[in-house]
């Protein structure tokens, strides 16, 4: 009986260490990886799990608060931040929406991935390993109502996935591939000039 308890205690300690590693990995990612780029696939699932929509594209970031999400399939859309403003360009509508970066980010997934003040904006919680990934949950300290939960998955020290549940229960999962840490990214990757004739909406 004693051996069984010792084995169980050792198992619990090992699990606790793994969970701590997930938080340490997330902290290390934010503190040490100043730039990065990857391909991504995004799957959005309805609250009842019945409907799924998929899209794909590329993601680049340069801390603090500069990032570029370029959706290419099934249709093009660009979200880019130069550190001061966030631009959303929808080519099909020929429409651009622009917001100040502080207003647009707050405690959002983009702020988590490209920001620099992790523990100021988020409360961190270790989650069990799942699907071969180490997971850490990040809960916004200021409840803004845009999403219920956010978790980040790592394979080793490499960013592998982000899963978001929004305020309506809709689940979005981004899976990253070909991640390159500390990539050399030119500053103009995070600049944006609205196309001629585009309808620009400032918020």
Curated annotation (Swiss-Prot):
It comes from Methylibium petroleiphilum (strain ATCC BAA-1232 / LMG 22953 / PM1). InterPro entries: LolA/LolB/LppX, OM_lipoprot_carrier_LolA-like, OM_lipoprot_carrier_LolA_Pbac. This is Outer-membrane lipoprotein carrier protein. The lineage of its organism: Bacteria, Pseudomonadati, Pseudomonadota, Betaproteobacteria, Burkholderiales. It is found in: Periplasm. Residues 1-20 form the signal peptide. GO terms for cellular component: periplasmic space. It comes from the Bacteria. Its main location: periplasm.
């Amino acid at each position: 009986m004693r051996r069984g308890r010792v084995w169980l205690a050792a198992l619990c300690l090992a699990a606790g260490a793994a969970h701590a590693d997930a938080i340490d990995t997330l902290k290390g990612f934010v503190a040490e990886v100043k730039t990065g780029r990857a391909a991504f696939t995004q799957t959005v699932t309805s609250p009842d799990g019945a409907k799924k929509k998929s899209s794909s594209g590329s993601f680049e970031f340069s801390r603090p608060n500069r990032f570029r999400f370029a959706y290419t399939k099934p249709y093009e859309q660009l979200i880019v931040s130069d550190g001061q403003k966030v631009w959303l360009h929808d080519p099909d509508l020929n429409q651009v929406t622009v917001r100040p970066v502080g207003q647009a980010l707050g405690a959002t997934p983009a702020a988590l991935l490209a920001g620099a003040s992790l523990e100021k904006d988020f409360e961190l919680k270790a989650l069990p390993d799942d699907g071969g990934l180490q997971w850490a949950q990040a809960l916004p300290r200021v409840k803004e109502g845009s999403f219920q939960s956010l978790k980040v998955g790592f394979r080793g020290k490499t960013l592998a996935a982000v899963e978001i549940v929004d305020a309506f229960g809709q689940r979005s999962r981004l899976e990253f591939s070909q991640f390159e840490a500390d990539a050399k990214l030119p500053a103009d990757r995070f600049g944006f000039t609205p196309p001629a004739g585009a309808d620009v909406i400032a918020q």
